Amino acid sequence: MNPFSKMIAAALALSEKAVENTLELLEEGCTIPFISRYRKEKTGNMDEVKIEAVAQANEKYKEMAKRKETILKTIGDQGKLSAELQQRIDNCWDATELEDIYLPFKPKRRTRAQVAREQGLEPLAQLLLLQRERNPEQAARKFVGDKVSDVEAALQGAKDIIAETVSENEQSRNQIRGEFRRGAIITSKVVAKKKDEEDAQRFSDYFDFSEPLKRCSSHRLLAMRRGEAAGFLRVSISADDEACTTKLKRHYVHGFGECQTLVGEAVDDAFKRLLKPSIETEFAAQSKQKADEEAIVVFAENLRQLLLAAPLGQKRVMAVDPGFANGCKTACLDAQGNLVHHEIVYPHPPRSKRMEATAAMKRMVRQYQVEAMAVGNGTASRETSEWLNEIDFEHPVDVYVVSEDGASIYSASKIAREEFPDEDVTVRGAVSIGRRLMDPLAELVKIDPKSIGVGQYQHDVDQSQLKKSLDSVVMSCVNSVGVNLNTASQHLLTYVSGLGPTLAKNIVEYRRENGAFSSRSQLKKVPRLGPSAYEQCAGFLRIPGARNPLDNSAVHPERYSLVETMAKDQGVTVKQLVEDKALQKKIDIRKYVSGEVGMPTLTDIMAELDKPGLDPRGEVEKFEFDASIKAIEDLQVGMVVPGIVTNITKFGAFVDIGVHNDGLVHVSQMANRYVSDPSEVVKLHEHVMVRVTEVDLKRKRIALSMKQL
């Protein structure tokens, strides 16, 4: 039994048995998508978010258990590990409390208190703390000698010992934490000599800023930390010093007298020199961690929405990477996304070869039977889209605007060089734009998520936590959609449950040598793909047109026999059962409940039989900007215009309204009600109507509102 399951269940308000089962599955090497989809009976129908939370809590407790081992060994080596202390450490599962217990025993550089102890002044410190001595100077004379020069040095050494004792006391530390928790203020000031630098102006909002720490939003905190890292700001966190020292003195100073005065001075020193910097650092780290976590959640959710954007599907596409002086790079792709042709046209100034460009586009559309166009949303996007929509092609061709974020990163990457070794970066970039329209998920997994541009301060947060979270999102999205085993790239297969880079490469090589897979069971012939990997991956891989229709569904091979029994009971084949919706409705799934298979799995199976291999991403929608607005100068306050949500943050959503500068809908302007999180109201790439409320031409800032629309 996992030693942490009880604590995890209590912390997450989950069934202890479900947590125990989930931890067992994780220990066996099962992936989160597999557990969530195919082990619902064991987990109590937990979704991926809950399973992830269980896994993270388990890792946290494991790390704490390791830390305890280190602490116990260190204290044991000092010969100071009493039975009572060991029990306290064994029973402690709060990281801050654990470090407080350890603090007095923690090896540290030679402190003033240690020097004083070496001088034999510990008894004097204890005497002063008792506060019964009427003449502390007289008591201190007994300690003057070879190591202590005079009474003043003796008393100072004793105060140093008291200060360290106070600073390492758990109750003292918790008192100061309480004051910081209640009233800590975060303050940001500009570094005077850098105030007029151009780059510093990005942080002008924080040149003289202060706010209660508990009310400071993650984006403001990260902005200040970025300004501090760049050398433009000084950021500090502080509480009410007087309130802190008063609280400490109430505990340590009893009455009035010379001893009490000395102890009071030691307490002041303990707070100013030791406690205050320590707790400030602790709260700075905690606030940074909290801000990081919030920013990572925002980025992860944005990435999920981007990856799960609706695909155009397998259609012949012409991709256009628009530009002025360097022309528009075009790439024609077949229905599988293979590059069949590319060239450059110059419809815009300075070359302005509009007629030749139009003729070239008509020729390519006719020759390669283009069904849709994908235009990158960068420079000259608006002008290019309008030009293409004006061309009278021989057959209808829909024009879509596609995000270019990260396309240049992909075009120079190792993956792109391997795919197109003989093409330059401009061609690779255009191909990526076209493929994003066809299947955003399959193309975006090739790009570092941080380059996609849908987060807030993603380069400032904990990079290892960010990578872990984003990898988890990519894996979740890939497996929730499912992957075509016969067309998926090696990179896409890498994210399938149970595979990884090596098995993904082996699958592609097997496919190249042996032709397309005709059944899932063929996967067992792939080198190094053993029973465990097969169990984890099979349900997420699809084979359109397979002899067994279940091979193109999310029904796991381990449940094929169950579906065969259902079909047999109805007197039909599995294929007939899949095709006959009326027949499916006659099945009473309760008859098939067993020790291994419960209602959650049976419900999932019936949903798959109804729509096998259904892509959950929906259908792509066309969008057009307001034709009368082409530049920020065209905007007027009060205008209502269409836009596309390009980024979502904690403080609002950015919307592209076709003027080369995204406008901001602040969270307070998102609805006619209170909105705590913008993602409650909008989704990435959603088409919205917005009202212009402010236009700052100098700073190129646009304020928008969605209220009363």
For the regions a language model picked out, list residue spans one by one:
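Long, highly charged, low-complexity intrinsically disordered interaction regions
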Residues: F4, K62-K80, D90, I409, ...
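Duplex nucleic acid-engaging cores and interfaces of nucleic-acid transaction enzymes
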Residues: K50-A53, K60-A319, A325-E423, A430
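Single-stranded RNA-binding regions, centering on S1/OB-family and related RNA-binding modules
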Residues: I543-L709
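Short flexible coil/turn linkers enriched for glycine and charged/polar residues
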Residues: S15-E16, E28-G29, A95-T96, R109, ...
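Structured, non-catalytic alpha/beta "coupling" segments that mediate domain-domain communication
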Residues: T74, R88, L98-I101, G227-D240, ...
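Short beta-alpha junctions and helix-cap segments that line functional grooves
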Residues: V317-A319, K329, S385-L388, S519-Q522, ...
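A glycine-rich phosphate-binding loop feature that marks nucleotide/adenosyl-phosphate handling sites
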Residues: G178-I185, V320-F324, G378-E383, V402-I409, ...
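Short, ordered loop/turn segments at secondary-structure junctions
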Residues: Y38-K40, L129, D240, P322, ...
